[in-house]
Regions:
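Conserved acidic carboxylate
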Residues: 10
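Two-component/phosphorelay signaling modules centered on CheY-like receiver
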Residues: 13-31, 98, 117
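Short hydrophobic/Thr-rich beta-strand motif most characteristic of the beta2 strand and flanking loop
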Residues: 27-34, 42, 78
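Acidic catalytic/metal-coordinating carboxylates
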Residues: 34-38, 62-66
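Active-site residues of response regulator receiver
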Residues: 55
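Receiver (REC) domain active-site loop signature in two-component systems and cognate sites
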Residues: 58
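C-terminal output helix
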Residues: 105-116, 122
């Protein structure tokens, strides 16, 4: 069985690079994007992507806007959101049932979220 294909989207180079390294060490195939526009291009070029790990707050296109645009074309794509915001109450109603992981996180916190997102049935 091949490694699940993930798209990691974060405008912070350090966070993205460290997270990608942790995910690769965890057995995942990871494509990195530094913006919503780059993520859309990566998804078009890589139809095998199963899951996006997306930062909420990015310049130009928020993580929520990115997910909305992706789901318009690929409704089966699942998402895990990562955020520096500790209080998630402002998100009520904006993400349906998406999984949220608060930065800073460890692989022990991120891995279960990724596994859960990958194991949920298709939409």
């Amino acid at each position: 069985m091949s490694a699940p294909n993930l798209l990691l989207v974060d405008d912070n180079d350090d966070v993205r690079e460290v997270t990608a390294l942790l995910l690769r060490d965890g057995g995942y195939s990871v494509i990195e994007a530094s913006s919503g526009v780059a993520a859309l291009a990566a998804l078009d070029a890589n139809p095998a992507i199963e899951l996006m790990i997306v930062d909420f707050s990015m310049p130009g296109m928020s993580g929520i806007e990115l997910l909305e645009r992706v789901r318009a074309k690929r409704p089966e794509i699942r998402a895990v959101f990562i955020t520096g915001y500790v209080d998630h109450t402002w998100l009520n109603g904006k993400l349906a049932d998406e999984i949220v992981v608060t930065k800073p996180f460890t692989m022990d916190e991120l891995a279960p979220a990724v596994r859960k997102a990958l194991s949920e049935p298709d939409i």
